[in-house]
């Protein structure tokens, strides 16, 4: 797993991504709308820079979608009901692959997870971009990965085929201090368990400061953007 950010890393990642036919980028960091008019989250900047160098890449900004929370159907009193055939999203436009089975999609007609799953099953590589908040990947990423639980549950434990075994995965996260490495490692294991074809070269992180969480300063946060641009220029 790559540890420290620099321009060479960016070029290596782009080179790796070019071997795939269709790449899906899922950006998960957010800001208040008026702030977004003036600045972009660092992880999203990386996604946009890389996408410009690829011939067939689609970016979906997850915070822009209306994605309802996971309902926890994997651990109901009447047993694991996640991803069963009865949860099929019966809509050819939203679910052309026929793979999308999620109760929350059925229970919430305005849910937009289908916009991600539809693109996912048409891609051979997906990269998640997230920020680190309180020792974990931020809430928009977490909500997304929980809602995709039905993908894993179809073959563990339902015993069906792994529908993402040919889709490579990556996870790139941005953090202020020491938790970024831990978050990246955990999500790599998570994606492997999900059934993705994990690509080691697409899992890395960037930290603004090589410090412990209790050593952070306001100055360090203020300097994080200039340092980010300096390292990746």
Tell me what each language-model feature is.
Residues 1-130, 134-153, 215-233:
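N-terminal beta1-alpha1-beta2 submodule of the flavodoxin-like/Rossmannoid cofactor-binding fold
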Residues 209:
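Substrate-binding cleft of secreted/luminal carbohydrate-active enzymes
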Residues 138-140, 157-203:
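Short, glycine-/small-residue-rich phosphate/pyrophosphate-handling segment
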Residues 55-61, 195-206:
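Short beta-strand elements in bilobed, periplasmic/extracellular small-molecule ligand-binding domains
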């Amino acid at each position: 797993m790559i540890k420290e950010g620099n321009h060479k890393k960016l070029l290596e990642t782009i080179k790796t991504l070019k071997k795939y036919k269709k790449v899906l980028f899922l950006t998960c960091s957010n800001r208040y709308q008026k702030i977004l008019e003036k600045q972009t989250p660092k992880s999203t900047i990386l996604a946009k820079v890389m996408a410009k160098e690829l011939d067939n890449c689609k970016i979906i900004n997850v915070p822009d979608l209306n994605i309802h929370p996971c309902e926890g159907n994997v651990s109901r009193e009447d047993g694991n009901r996640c991803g069963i055939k009865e949860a099929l999203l019966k809509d050819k436009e939203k679910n052309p692959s026929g793979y999308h089975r999620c109760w929350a999609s059925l229970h919430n007609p305005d849910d937009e997870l289908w916009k991600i799953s539809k693109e996912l099953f048409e891609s051979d590589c997906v990269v998640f971009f997230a920020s680190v908040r309180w020792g974990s990947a931020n809430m928009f990423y977490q909500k997304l990965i929980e809602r995709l639980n039905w993908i894993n549950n179809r073959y563990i434990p339902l015993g069906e085929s792994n529908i993402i075994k040919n889709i490579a995965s990556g996870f790139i996260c941005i953090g202020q201090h020491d938790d970024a490495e831990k978050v990246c490692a955990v999500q790599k294991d998570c994606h492997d368990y999900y059934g993705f074809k994990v690509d080691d070269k697409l899992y890395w992180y960037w930290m603004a400061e090589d410090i412990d969480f209790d050593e952070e300063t306001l100055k360090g946060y203020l300097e994080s953007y200039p340092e980010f641009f300096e390292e990746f220029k």
